[in-house]
Amino acid sequence: MKKVKVLIGNYGSGKSELALNFAMQSAARGERTELIDLDMVNTYFRLTERGKMVEQKEIRLVSPNFACSGIETLSLPAEVQSAFVLDWDSVIFDVGGDDVGATALGRYHQDFVDLPEGSLEVLNVVNIRRPLASTLEKIHRLQEGMQAHSRLQITGMINNTNLATMTTADELWDGYELLRQVADASGIPVAYTTGKKEFLDAFLSRNPDPKYVRSEEHTSELQSR
């Protein structure tokens, strides 16, 4: 059965780096993989070396079209529909957490609804070191806005708390402490805890409650985006 992951998050959450990691892990398992960049503000893959790396791994990349040079002229390509009609093993969506990004995702609401039960994960990538996601109330407000504009229910949160090159194991632990509160208050579980191996090992050595932890190692250099 095709597995679809939608990664949504505000600027600085690290969602684009995670989308890349998930796609590369799927491809490494021999899965037919498609990565769809629906971030209409930060064109992470189209304008960076990341795009070339994706193609080298035989991952199909779909990015926004540029009608001309201005960012305001971005448009969604027809190829987005291939996520739903072609026979992929794994599809990863990288979606901006602002109103524009979430609304773009909402255009495909019925396509997501028509997916087989259990095949879709909608994951809010959270970095509590970013000002817009630093408290329970702010995260709750962000998630409500994402769900309203995308017309999809968030199925899980990803603790991706980091300070880029200044990250320590404390970032993941602080994210864990806050997101367990968010999970208890909202009913949205913590689906993944992500970071470099050294930080994950230190984090797990502190024996966090397994209910709020599922660890995933970054396979490429962590950058907040």
Which ranges hold each PLM region?
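Conserved lysine of the Walker
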Residues: K15
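N-terminal phosphate/diphosphate-binding loop that engages ATP/GTP or pyrophosphate donors
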Residues: Q25-E79
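Switch II (G3) loop of P-loop NTPases
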Residues: P64-S69, D89-L105
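Conserved small/polar residues in nucleotide/adenosyl-binding loops
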Residues: E217-S224
